């Protein structure tokens, strides 16, 4: 199978840098780049090396992944280099992750990683190497429409990663290539097997790669011990219903773990108040949000003032909304919207841009005022 990397040069004069994580997706991208006849260089960033993650299936950019990337590079016959970006990753991703949780928000570290370490630091390395583009294994499409570069969702909706890439700038998108955006994952694994790549059936990486056991609260508490302090669980009128063991164990919309008995209806986490160490709970209806204030907005288009579709979680269905440059107003109340999450804007399959949710305004229901 051949892929057009959309480089306006003879194939023999092209140089492509591939971000190789050690997984099947980026390995196939490297093989596709090599097959074009372009000079292909594989680069892996060492982002962390937690002992528990090194041998764990589903980690990313730890020790075993680096070895897998090197083995693939040797198999397809391309040079491979490893750059230590552990300090950059800690400062721009892990520290931000911790501070957001401590502040009672819900972070999305994969977006910060793409925004900083991958599409800033690694992209700069590719430019310094004289590459014509940086290719990655992300499932998203880069299309050229009337000489304008656009980002579109992957053809396979189950694999689409556009939510995590909204912060990509126009300049970065112009330089990036995403060869797998039009392919289903089974086809990619099939291609890897046909090429004899050892990673053909390797497990996919996890969303939070630096949390080897899934216990993100432990990571936060290790970095910020006071974050594990307990406090009161209160209802929306401020009445104390119970105690919690630390706000870092909870997110907006959560039900499990509250351990509050004797209630007439199920209670959900409505809000976290770090200043008072209070966990505010209420009925599901209280989760309804009418609008959200958005910060750090990044546009991939020159302007858009019509109704759009918005995703406030990666797995959520897009919902209709309008954005005036500051406030995102939902057509219908949206549930479980948490400060710290990303709001990504779409027009059909095209990614318009997005931003970070700073504050939310609840929808008003008469029976919640009692």
Curated annotation (Swiss-Prot):
Residues forming the catalytic site: 113, 209
Keywords noted in UniProt: ATP-binding, Cytoplasm, Disulfide bond, Nucleotide-binding, RNA-binding, Transferase, tRNA processing, tRNA-binding
Reaction equation(s) it catalyzes: S-sulfanyl-L-cysteinyl-[protein] + uridine(34) in tRNA + AH2 + ATP = 2-thiouridine(34) in tRNA + L-cysteinyl-[protein] + A + AMP + diphosphate + H(+)
Enzyme class: transferase
Family (UniProt): Belongs to the MnmA/TRMU family.
Biological role stated in the UniProt entry: Catalyzes the 2-thiolation of uridine at the wobble position (U34) of tRNA, leading to the formation of s(2)U34.
Protein name, as recorded: tRNA-specific 2-thiouridylase MnmA
Organism: Zymomonas mobilis subsp. mobilis (strain ATCC 31821 / ZM4 / CP4)
Gene: mnmA
């Amino acid at each position: 199978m051949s892929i057009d990397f959309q480089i306006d040069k003879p194939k023999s004069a092209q140089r492509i840098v591939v971000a190789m994580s050690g997984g099947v997706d980026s390995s196939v991208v490297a093989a596709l780049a090599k097959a074009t006849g372009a000079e292909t260089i594989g680069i892996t960033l060492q982002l962390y090396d937690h002992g528990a993650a090194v041998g764990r299936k589903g980690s990313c950019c730890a020790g075993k992944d680096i070895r897998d990337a090197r083995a693939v590079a040797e198999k397809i016959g391309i040079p491979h280099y490893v750059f230590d970006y552990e300090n950059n990753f800690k400062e721009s991703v892990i520290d931000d992750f911790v501070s957001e949780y401590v502040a009672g928000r819900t972070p999305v570290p994969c977006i910060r990683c793409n925004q900083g370490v991958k599409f800033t630091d690694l992209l700069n390395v590719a430019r310094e190497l004289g590459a014509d583009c940086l290719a990655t294994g992300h499932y998203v499409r880069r299309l050229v429409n009337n000489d304008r570069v656009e980002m579109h969702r992957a053809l396979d909706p189950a694999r689409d990663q556009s939510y995590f890439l909204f912060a990509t700038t126009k300049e970065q998108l112009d330089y990036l290539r995403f060869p797998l955006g039009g392919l289903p994952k089974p086809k990619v694994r099939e291609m890897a097997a046909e090429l004899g790549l050892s990673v053909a059936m390797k497990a996919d990486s996890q969303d939070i790669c630096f949390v080897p056991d899934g216990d993100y609260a432990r990571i936060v508490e290790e970095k910020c011990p006071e974050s594990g302090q307990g406090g009161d669980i209160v209802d929306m009128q401020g009445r104390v219903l119970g105690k919690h063991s630390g706000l870092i164990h909870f997110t907006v919309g959560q039900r499990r773990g509250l351990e509050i008995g004797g209630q007439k209806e199920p209670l959900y986490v409505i809000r976290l108040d770090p200043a008072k160490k209070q966990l505010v709970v209420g009925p599901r209806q209280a989760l309804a949000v009418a609008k959200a204030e958005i910060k750090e907005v990044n546009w991939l288009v020159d302007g858009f003032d019509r109704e759009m579709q918005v995703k406030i979680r990666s797995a959520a269905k897009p919902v209709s909304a309008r954005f005036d440059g500051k406030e995102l107003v939902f057509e219908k109340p949206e549930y479980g919207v948490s400060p710290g999450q990303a709001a990504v804007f779409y027009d059909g399959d095209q990614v318009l841009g997005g931003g970070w949710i700073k504050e939310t305004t609840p929808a008003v229901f008469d029976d919640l005022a009692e």
